[in-house]
Amino acid sequence: MPTRSAHTQTSAHSKPARSRARDAIALLKADHKTVSGLFKEYEKAEDAARKAELAEEICNELTIHAAIEEDIFYPQARDALSDDNDGISLLDEAEVEHGSLKVLIAEIEDALESARMDGKTDAKVTVLKEYVEHHVKEEEKQLFPKLRKSGLDLSEVGEQLRERKEEIKAEGMSGLQQLS
């Protein structure tokens, strides 16, 4: 992903154009696409070491994604949709789904730390994929359209998400340990 980091480095010089080009929804959809691609690679992988590597990358990407959604996106979405009962219900469901995803991620990470890339771990990655696909579908088809109409400043929220994501990556995921 050298292109992505090179693009991120130049964003300081072109912040307004970058913000318009990658609002919060665009950033979250890009994350969804990245994780979907990793799951596809995982399904094709035959070597246990490669599967373990991909499972770890999937877990890391999802952990970062969940953190920025929970810390920044969901609270602001909740404020923007405060008069929309369906929107609030979608956010409640998304937060509950995150809880289930975190349990599976923790179980997969425990297995990886114990070097257990077995059938059970493989099944957990498959179930994680199914949960993520369901979660993504609801966000992209139901929640995001509501937020586009809400008046929420998605460019500003996108900038906040980008900054937090960069902080987490710079901290090497250590800042996330206290979130669990």
PLM region spans:
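Small-residue-biased structural context
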Residues: M1-S180
